[in-house]
Amino acid sequence: MGGRVFLVFLAFCVWLTLPGAETQDSRGCARWCPQDSSCVNATACRCNPGFSSFSEIITTPMETCDDINECATLSKVSCGKFSDCWNTEGSYDCVCSPGYEPVSGAKTFKNESENTCQDVDECQQNPRLCKSYGTCVNTLGSYTCQCLPGFKLKPEDPKLCTDVNECTSGQNPCHSSTHCLNNVGSYQCRCRPGWQPIPGSPNGPNNTVCEDVDECSSGQHQCDSSTVCFNTVGSYSCRCRPGWKPRHGIPNNQKDTVCEDMTFSTWTPPPGVHSQTLSRFFDKVQDLGRDYKPGLANNTIQSILQALDELLEAPGDLETLPRLQQHCVASHLLDGLEDVLRGLSKNLSNGLLNFSYPAGTELSLEVQKQVDRSVTLRQNQAVMQLDWNQAQKSGDPGPSVVGLVSIPGMGKLLAEAPLVLEPEKQMLLHETHQGLLQDGSPILLSDVISAFLSNNDTQNLSSPVTFTFSHRSVIPRQKVLCVFWEHGQNGCGHWATTGCSTIGTRDTSTICRCTHLSSFAVLMAHYDVQEEDPVLTVITYMGLSVSLLCLLLAALTFLLCKAIQNTSTSLHLQLSLCLFLAHLLFLVAIDQTGHKVLCSIIAGTLHYLYLATLTWMLLEALYLFLTARNLTVVNYSSINRFMKKLMFPVGYGVPAVTVAISAASRPHLYGTPSRCWLQPEKGFIWGFLGPVCAIFSVNLVLFLVTLWILKNRLSSLNSEVSTLRNTRMLAFKATAQLFILGCTWCLGILQVGPAARVMAYLFTIINSLQGVFIFLVYCLLSQQVREQYGKWSKGIRKLKTESEMHTLSSSAKADTSKPSTVN
């Protein structure tokens, strides 16, 4: 059915074309030619010029004529230079490129021969094409704007010129003594305020060179008459004259500084002290203050020191005052003298001054402008050395002052003054000393000295000051301390050591280093030095050597004796190994204090090994308790399983965690000056003593409970001999274990008081022979071990006999092999 419809439709289309064909045939041209084509005949068409089709002759109405792009790259059309080809429908045009125009006047042309294009001068057509500070410059086909010198094109607007800031762009060649001043399109090199051009130099061009104006010598300053003009680079300052100080609220070293006379520092008697001698001294001081003139500062200083020297040489009724009041008077004199000398010394001329007086009082002063060096002041009994930069107060332009006054007579008023030590230093002293004697106070060995600077902020110096004291001989078995006088809130004070350390001491001299300034001295404190007992040393080394041998034999026994290997011997083996390593390291490395890092590592290792030893002691006690409990409750296999899971993580893990925490918190406290062990400062030693006390306490409780269980067991037993003997052996081992593994550490902690020496001997003897006791109890007293020793002994003798027989047999064979000799 579909095929029939298609045939009918095709026949209908043919029928429709027949009239046209008849018409074309009648004219001789095809009516179906496509657009932009021309008829050739009744059956063919051809595209018009400027168009093309798939074939040159079109024979079907389905073909089309398309425009030819004559301006395409492969086209033969050539418009010539300065022109562009423009394609049109069926043709093309040549036009001049932008910026060019034809001379002939025709706007389009067809080929290069008709090309008359030439450049258009846009700058001539529009002279204002470029904006301010720009000049139009014609180019082929276009133009550019060139900026005047000192200007540059703005990137976002190529017709606009903006000013170049030569001062910030680094393009100016101004001399370092000048200041660059930017102008529109240019710059100037001008002298700064307080500067002027050198002779022959202009002021403005780039070759300007300037020099500082000395306002002080030229009279251009405005300093007040109470000040002195000081020229500075590019400016000047006004400083107070010697003996003057800035008025209240007005800073010194400014152009508007105004000064007034510096009055004598107020120095009055201490309140609550009644002494005619002291009153006469302060009357002299008040008279000196009323008559004080800045130009007479040198004389005033000498008069004050003379009066103080006389006061301390003959203190009179001051010696009858209670000790506390004498200390208060001394504190008041030291504090006031420092303030007065600091103020008066600022009025002295630059240089080094030394004063000495009959009773031994000395003053050394150095006044200088600030310099970058160290300063050393020397006296008969003391030397002070410090960095000169410490003397200058920030913002104070005046001269720097360093002073050292030695007052030997002050020791009379400071007799029996208390000494207050820092807690850390107190603990450190107790490590090497028995402690302060109950019936003695510190003895003043050296003169009392007082150091002062023009800078009164000396509580925390950026670099320490060093003192070298000469003093009388030190009594043997005493401790020498570098101290300073710390003023109390009640007007008195005490000796202290905060911020001061003893660098070194000999029989008659001591070097001290402090981070602050005050009044200083050297004390001889009544400490009994803990000298090393040679007998204890011999006992320690001999006992530990024997213990090492016994521990090695015990460890080999626990490893090689198959008959006794169980959970108990595993505990014994780990305990023996830890104790062996700890004792060995103690013997060879406890005194290796020369290298701090190595000593710290040794101390940390000893800490771990002894903690591990203690932990295995605890596991031994726990296992002994569980074994005793097993006498009444049959669960031996569960005890073994429990101990096997527990013992290694606890035995080695707990000490490792403890040492790791200690090392992470305070690693610098591993290693002491005398041995590679834990320092007592800040309670660090309790990282070892704490576990010792805890384990000893737990072991004691377990021991008592074990004895109670054994007591009940013994009372319930019948007369069966073997059971009774085994139970008694267990009780004996329990008692021996407490004595060997717990009692020794308890004795070490109890080395205090009158019985300290006895405890030290007991601790040393028992602890050094600990390995011997372990070998005795766990090896020699064990029947199975003795039997194994017997087997090993027989085997060794048998091997020895066989070796001897083999040797004899070899000798006999050698003799028979020799030829006989006939005489």
UniProtKB/Swiss-Prot annotation:
Residues 354-530 form the GAIN-B domain. SUPFAM superfamilies: EGF/Laminin, Growth factor receptor domain. It is a multi-pass membrane protein. Autoproteolytically cleaved into 2 subunits, an extracellular alpha subunit and a seven-transmembrane beta subunit. Disulfide bonds join 29-39, 33-45, 47-65, 71-85, 79-94, 96-117, 123-136, 130-145, 147-161, 167-180, 174-189, 191-210, 216-229, 223-238, 240-259, 482-512, 500-514. Cell surface receptor that binds to the chondroitin sulfate moiety of glycosaminoglycan chains and promotes cell attachment. Promotes granulocyte chemotaxis, degranulation and adhesion. In macrophages, promotes the release of inflammatory cytokines, including IL8 and TNF. Signals probably through G-proteins. Is a regulator of mast cell degranulation. Belongs to the G-protein coupled receptor 2 family. Adhesion G-protein coupled receptor (ADGR) subfamily. Its main location: membrane. It is found in: Cell membrane; Cell projection, Ruffle membrane. SMART domains: EGF, EGF_CA, GPS. This is Adhesion G protein-coupled receptor E2. Residues 24-540, 591-605, 666-683, 757-760 are extracellular. The chain crosses the membrane at residues 541-561, 570-590, 606-626, 645-665, 684-704, 736-756, 761-781. Glycans are attached at residues 41, 111, 206, 298, 347, 354, 456, 460. It comes from the Eukaryota. Forms a heterodimer, consisting of a large extracellular region non-covalently linked to a seven-transmembrane moiety. Interacts with chondroitin sulfate; the interaction with chondroitin sulfate is calcium-dependent. Interacts with CD55. The record marks 517-518 as: Cleavage. Changing residue 492 to Y: In VBU; affects the regulation of mast cells degranulation; results in increased vibration-induced mast cells degranulation; no effect on localization to plasma membrane. Residues 482-530 are annotated as: GPS. Keywords: Autocatalytic cleavage, Calcium, Cell adhesion, Cell membrane, Cell projection, Disease variant, Disulfide bond, EGF-like domain, G-protein coupled receptor, Glycoprotein, Inflammatory response, Membrane, Receptor, Repeat, Signal, Transducer, Transmembrane, Transmembrane helix. Expression is restricted to myeloid cells. Highest expression was found in peripheral blood leukocytes, followed by spleen and lymph nodes, with intermediate to low levels in thymus, bone marrow, fetal liver, placenta, and lung, and no expression in heart, brain, skeletal muscle, kidney, or pancreas. Expression is also detected in monocyte/macrophage and Jurkat cell lines but not in other cell lines tested. High expression in mast cells. It is linked to Vibratory urticaria: An autosomal dominant disorder characterized by localized hives and systemic manifestations in response to dermal vibration, with coincident degranulation of mast cells and increased histamine levels in serum. The gene is ADGRE2. GO terms for molecular function: calcium ion binding; chondroitin sulfate binding; G protein-coupled receptor activity. CDD domains: 7tmB2_EMR, EGF_CA. The GPS region of the GAIN-B domain is necessary, but not sufficient for receptor cleavage, which require the entire extracellular stalk. GO terms for biological process: adenylate cyclase-activating G protein-coupled receptor signaling pathway; cell adhesion; cell migration; cell surface receptor signaling pathway; G protein-coupled receptor signaling pathway; granulocyte chemotaxis; inflammatory response; regulation of mast cell degranulation.
